[in-house]
Amino acid sequence: GRVSLRQAHIALGIFLVAYILSFIDRQILSLMVEPIKQDLGLSDLQVGLLQGLAFAILYAVVGIPVGMLADRISRRRIIAVGVLFWSASTALCGFAGSYAHLFMARMGVGLGEASLSPSAHSWLSDAYPPAQLSRAMAIYNLGITIGGLALLVGGAVVDMVAQSGAIVLPVFGPMPTWRAAFLLVALPGALVAALVFIAREPARRARSKAGMPLRAALSHLRDHKRTFIAIYANSTLLSIMGYGLTAWYPTLLIRGFALTPGQASLRLGLIYLLLGSMGSLAGGFAAERLTLKGVRDANLRVVMIIALLCLFPALLAPLMPSPALLLVLFGLLTLFFNGYFGCSLAAIQLATPPNMRATGAALFLLANSLVGLSLGTAIVPLIDSALFGGHGQIGSALATVGLCATLLAAVAAWSGLRSYAQTIESVAQR
């Protein structure tokens, strides 16, 4: 049946906690690159594939069928099982005896986490009145920015375990610190899964309109291909850079300036949390102001400007000779960069008819996750190997990725400004 506003708020709070936990389990590997490399004899490229491709393969692809499943069966069960599955997979990372085992465990993390957002979006859409849904979704999506806590919490866990030395577990015996860290961050999963069952699942609202047939949706994309190529290319290029930053800046600070994982995570986590939140709000505010002034291509124009603003800090930050200078420029980069995601999603929504907007958003998230996450984490060590001799020149590789991604993203957005304005005008007249 219907749920009260209080019950809706309880569910929203639980989903936000689950979303934050998912980022902790997803990102903690980036704080333990060096010990994992030494213990398993891995290269930077192999670690990059663990952070990106291994996670993204199932995370990106499974999200769409999970969303369809969430429209048919209990979303509470889907979310609870997903939380337990990704937490168990995170724990299995700590027991991995080879690269293949660790790769498969990371795939399991991606598979479990794919259950959360589609089901939570569906749940919240039924729990909140339409007038309050935007605010609820905004609060849930704060998990992306609050995901900066993943670095704070994860770094503290890694440092704590490292200071205590090897941990001895019954049956398994002594465990290296990085393995124990995976086990510790996996533990809250059981509690979060139990909390999901506290929330009361709302009845599903009747869908007043059927989705656009696949042929018609593809026809719309084809008729406005210049618009969609510009949006998808811009957002995918920026996501490649963004995932590269998340995956390799902790290693850059640890390897280049001898910071501990806890020290690196504290600095980067606070930047993500504070400046990332400000950037997200600023991007949306700028696009809204331009739209109110009659600029029809406001969202795409803002992401073009964001790409240009990111160019110099993305190029210079990883080349700085001191951690202080690096972090100042990284803070600017984070402030500018975080405004793109919301504007890109809004651009997609305005360029698609109402009955195919879920399809447009799903394709957007698929491209950002599968291409951005897979390539973004692997391209840094690939460039290091191809251009800098594979000597661990992560800073130079990050600078190269930043320069190329921002320039190409700006060009992609610029190329679609005129067609984008025409597309949204066409959609508005339907």
Language-model-detected regions and their locations in the chain:
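Glycine-rich segments within core transmembrane alpha-helices of 12-TM secondary carriers
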Residues: 137-159, 272-280, 365-377
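Juxtamembrane intracellular "pre-TM" segments in multi-pass secondary transporters
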Residues: 1-4, 201-231, 256
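Extracellular/periplasmic helix-loop-helix junction of adjacent transmembrane segments
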Residues: 32-61
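Extracytoplasmic gate region of multi-pass secondary transporters
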Residues: 29-30, 226-280, 341, 345, ...
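Conserved MFS/SLC helix-loop-helix module at the cytosolic interface between two early adjacent transmembrane helices
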Residues: 61-97
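Cytoplasmic helix-loop-helix junction between adjacent transmembrane helices
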Residues: 105-143
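Helix-breaking motifs and short loop linkers at transmembrane-helix boundaries and internal kinks
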Residues: 41, 74, 95-101, 129, ...
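Helix-loop-helix hairpin linking two adjacent transmembrane segments in secondary transporters
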Residues: 140-197
